Amino acid sequence: SRKRNKFLIALIILLVAAIIGTLAYIVVKNLNENNERKSLDNIAGSYASGIENGTTSATEVTSPSINVKKVENPIDFKSLQQQNSDIYSWIYIPNTNVNYPVLQSHLDDNLYLDHDIYKNYSFSGSIYSQMCNKRDYSDRVTVLYGHNMANGSMFATLHRFYDADFFNKNRYIYVYTPDRKLTYEIVSAFEY
């Protein structure tokens, strides 16, 4: 009976420790995610100040064959690329939280799966493409990768496109490069 009591006490202590450890992990993870989201918002505010207020003036391109004239770009690519030369474009989707730099590593296709624009570990990672895609978006298909974060960052708000009314009112994705603005029409939204 005494051995059984010691065993039960040890089991209870172990369970309590596991619960405390799990709760601590969840709290720290949520704090880190929220800090990362604030950092991402600061990046958008610092380097892409002209996008959300409708003052975008970069040349709009919908086809590579169109001749374009270069005008002022709302994205400060010079400052961004001083931070990290892997930053090559910016994606913005109105009425979502998607307003981020796009990166591509020349060494590791999935580096930015779990690294921020400063190449530090980041649970939410960054928006990125792999080396098989050209940085000028001249490929027939360019795949951009990003997490579906519970805190609403990265590509989490793309779920809004499941709502037909939202979909019909928000039909465009804007991608900025240092020399042009590309506009893509959203023709379908589905869960993969």
Language model: regions and residue ranges:
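Hydrophobic membrane-insertion alpha-helices, especially the h-region
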Residues: 10-25
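Solvent-exposed, non-transmembrane regions of membrane-associated and secreted proteins
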Residues: 21-192
